[in-house]
């Protein structure tokens, strides 16, 4: 993701009501073709820019999410979450609209050289929910990493699954493809979040899919085929998250105390 990654989704807000800092960075591009067993691409270690965003004066006041940061009794990556309406992320609404117009989850749709949607969904039958997460994560991770500039000629673009099948994409595009795949396999949208975060070890912006399951928050990451609990990834500092039900701004606990509502592969 490039420096204007967040600008694609976030409108310009007045600085007086700032809730959080958002961070920017980049990752290494990869070849266009999607080999059957390609490994996820490592991230490029580039400096991260910083920009402050604040809530618009006419927006609904930000309120802490119930039961910790997720509404599932889990403080995601140790944060407090402030919930906001989807209207504050018009780019995500555009993703939802484009995906509805170009669905890929029909039985005969060819996903790669050897797998149709019917075959992939058949492989998920009889598996535990956690095993399904592992299946979906590793399946989409076979696509190579490719930057938005190489794909679309612009620094920031969130691709829908139909576009990802043709061109692959970068970290948020993997997360989007996994989100909609799991939704088709029966996972409720409310139990999933696309999370935009800062990787404090690699010093870059990144995006993953988080799925809440059996009292845990599991991370599906294009950098690893290992699906693991969020608590093991202490280098991940979430900035905001989104699903079809709403958007959340995430702040570490100590920082949140000063904020009042309203205002490499493994």
Model feature map: region roles:
Residues 2-6, 11-16, 25-266:
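A structural boundary/capping signal
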């Amino acid at each position: 993701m490039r420096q204007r990654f967040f600008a694609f989704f976030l409108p310009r807000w007045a600085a007086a009501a700032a809730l959080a800092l958002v961070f920017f960075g980049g990752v290494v591009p990869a070849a266009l073709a999607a080999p059957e067993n390609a490994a996820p691409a490592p991230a490029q270690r580039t400096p991260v820019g910083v920009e402050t965003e604040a809530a618009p004066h006419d927006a609904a006041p930000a309120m802490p999410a119930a039961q910790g940061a997720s509404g599932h009794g889990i403080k995601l990556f140790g944060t407090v979450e402030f919930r906001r309406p989807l209207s504050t992320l018009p780019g995500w609404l555009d993703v939802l609209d484009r995906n509805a117009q170009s669905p890929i989850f029909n039985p005969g749709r060819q996903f790669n050289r050897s797998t149709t949607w019917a075959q992939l969904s058949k492989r998920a039958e009889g598996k535990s929910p956690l095993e399904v997460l592992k299946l979906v994560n590793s399946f989409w991770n076979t696509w190579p990493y490719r930057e938005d500039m190489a794909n679309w000629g612009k620094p920031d673009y969130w691709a829908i699954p139909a576009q990802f099948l043709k061109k692959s994409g970068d970290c948020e595009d993997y997360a989007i493809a996994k989100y909609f795949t799991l939704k088709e396999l029966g996972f409720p949208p409310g139990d999933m979040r696309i999370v935009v975060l800062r990787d404090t070890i690699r010093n870059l912006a990144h995006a993953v899919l988080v799925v809440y399951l059996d009292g845990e928050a599991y991370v599906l990451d294009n950098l690893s085929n290992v699906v693991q609990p969020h608590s093991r990834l202490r280098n991940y500092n979430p900035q905001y998250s989104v699903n079809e039900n709403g958007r959340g701004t995430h702040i570490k606990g100590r920082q949140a105390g000063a904020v009042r509502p309203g205002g490499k592969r493994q």
